[in-house]
A protein has these predicted regions:
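Outer-membrane beta-barrel proteins
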Residues: 1, 14, 70-74, 127-129
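Repeat-solenoid scaffold signature
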Residues: 1-18
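Residues that define the transmembrane beta-barrel architecture of outer-membrane proteins
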Residues: 5-7, 78-82, 95, 133-137
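Residues on the lipid-exposed face of transmembrane beta-strands in outer-membrane beta-barrel proteins
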Residues: 11-15, 26, 84-88, 101-103, ...
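Transmembrane beta-strands of outer-membrane beta-barrel pores
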Residues: 17-19, 28-34, 103-109, 145
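Extracytoplasmic gating/loop element in the C-terminal half of outer-membrane beta-barrel translocons
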Residues: 20-93, 98
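C-terminal beta-signal and terminal closure region of outer-membrane beta-barrel proteins
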Residues: 74-76, 111-145
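Short active-site-adjacent structural elements
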Residues: 94-95, 108-112
Length: 145
């Protein structure tokens, strides 16, 4: 199987408002979701008693992992993220100082970033195991001398 072409899209914009010496910046990223699997762990007991018995035990290992869906046919949701920054620029005693606030995940999306890809009949296949971090802010101070 050949992995299909999937596009990452990224953008960055910055602007300094000259009259107020305020710097604005935003980044945007759009990343396709990972491809999903349904990994089933078949052991010797299941192979011997399964719907189509193999008629012998597995050779060399007590278990075999089988992906039940063809590769690159199921994908997770695309992840979009916007980050924003605003900073005030001050010139004090010949030094350039910036007081800033960075806001990550501005739209507060809660996209699933990882799934349980182990298939167990009646089990938690595709249950989320990780989410994109929630919106948060960071204060910053930069002094250039």
């Amino acid at each position: 199987y050949v992995e299909p072409y999937r596009t990452d899209i990224r953008g960055l914009a910055t602007y300094t408002i000259p009259r107020w010496d305020v710097q604005l910046a935003a980044t945007w990223i759009s990343v396709p979701g990972e491809y999903l699997e349904a990994n089933f762990v078949a052991d010797n007991a299941w192979i011997a008693a399964g719907p189509q018995p193999l008629g012998r035990a597995l050779t060399g290992a007590a278990v075999a992992t089988v992906n039940l869906i063809p590769p690159y046919t199921m994908f997770a949701d695309r992840r979009n993220n916007v980050d924003f920054r605003v900073a005030k620029i001050l010139h004090i005693a010949g030094m350039r100082t910036q007081f800033g606030v960075d806001i990550y995940n501005l739209m507060n999306t809660d996209v699933v970033t990882a799934y349980n890809q182990t298939f167990v009949p009646g089990g938690p296949w595709l249950a989320p195991t990780a989410l994109q971090p929630a919106r948060y802010a960071r204060l910053s101070l930069e002094i250039a001398f």
